[in-house]
Amino acid sequence: MRYNNLELFLNSIKAGKLCTGCCITFSDPAVTEIAAEAGFDFCWIDGEHGILDRTTAMMHILALKGTKCAPFYRVPSCDHTEIKKIIDLAPAGIIVPMVMNESDAEYAVKACRYPLSGNRGCGMRRGHCYGTMPMEEYMKNAEKEPLIILQIEHIEAVRNLDKILQIPGIDSIMIGPYDLSCSMGLAGQWAHSEVIAVLDEVCEKTRNAGILLGAYAETDLSRWIKKRQIQY
């Protein structure tokens, strides 16, 4: 954890802080370093919509070492080959978009953990401190990190949420309000009463499951977030 600030992020959550982050879509890692210096608790490095390759992803993650900001990386999908490319870079969290059902959730969780908890391939690189960390310590850490963050951003996923939340190993649910509104035929209208009702349902069920709750937010959404006990 000393290489990705995960413990610092989790301690802030436990202390009741609403952690804030910055979404990174540009290739220059200086942008990520600037975000950390600006005081953000985490950076969401976007491999789904951003123009980033694996080498660039590594540079963004390294840019946060020595800061107080945790690197989260959003992969393009729950495909284990996509997750494998990033997880060896030792980000604090893996964000998996468009999780639709319990099968997607289980697939993502297993891709992030070694056997017997999952099916991650054994690639000891940065998380193993390039061979300087005792193997026992590394494997113990690998059972807890990175955070496995699943995005609920489609009405189909909401309908399947009860089953999704029953999958062992999920660390956090992150709400995607804009994609959710699109899937409801209300594109961009996150404040519509029907969308708000669905967002509230996701919040309540996630909190009741004892799972960390995050959300994408712009200025207007931030007021809604504070009222729903969203943690980051």
Regions found by a protein language model. Name each.
Residues 1-232:
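Expand to "…catalyze enediolate/carbanion chemistry for C-C bond making/breaking, isomerization
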